[in-house]
């Protein structure tokens, strides 16, 4: 195990063993708002907050937007969950990820407030404290589970709230274990003072979203304003004015390409020009999202004519997306699969 991985595990262990911080899921905004109040409201210093909410596609949408905004010579801070390799990945600060030292320092500041928080709330405050110091142009914030009382639902006037695919993930956190309740928790508590973007949804989900947003005063942009199209073996983003080729060797499935298109729609509305977007698309990669691993110890254990594909799908929707991609491969496929008991 690498030294960096050990540092990450040690930090997670410190969080888990701290008596002030709870490992359990407990949705309540009072605790985190009290901490932020005691810290003089650092969340109010964050510019152009983009909340990314939903069940599947938050990471790929956030990552695509981050690439487009930074290609436009602007800086982003980004908060993701969960991390893949180490805790630092959760906290992007514009030029680099937070260091272990900066994370530890932030934990001590939070601990001094003597307020019981969940571990996810602590991680959210760590991001806010450090992003507030950076004054970056945009702050991209991925929601945790649901949104109504999620610790990222803190901003009255976000620049954008983007809703990716909503499905039956996180039913275990709800008293009413229905898709309707998931939709309500994710879109029923959005800001009335923002621009709401809705990603591709099943017709029933889209109908319910329409119903919930009837009384919302924000500008709402539905997914019928753009689409993913295929022509002569190539994929394109298309809206009424523009057509952009999706020139990528890293993004493979229809679901992920739709998330890329969703990001293109938002980027265009942020006045990022078409040429910048076209130049940036070939560079975008999504870790552990139908990703072909190119290096590492495992690659040395396969034959030269074999490929190693990694995907972290953990819902029915993302599993179907992976399965549909695998059906396009005209080669023998061998799989190693694991899943937690609660799925």
PLM features: residue spans?
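Acidic, Mg2+-coordinating active-site environments of NTP-dependent enzymes
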Residues: 47, 134-142, 158-279
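Hydrophobic positions on the alpha1 helix immediately C-terminal to the Walker A/P-loop
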Residues: 60-64
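Aromatic/hydrophobic pocket-lining residues that form π-stacking "cages" and hydrophobic walls in ligand
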Residues: 65, 127, 207-210
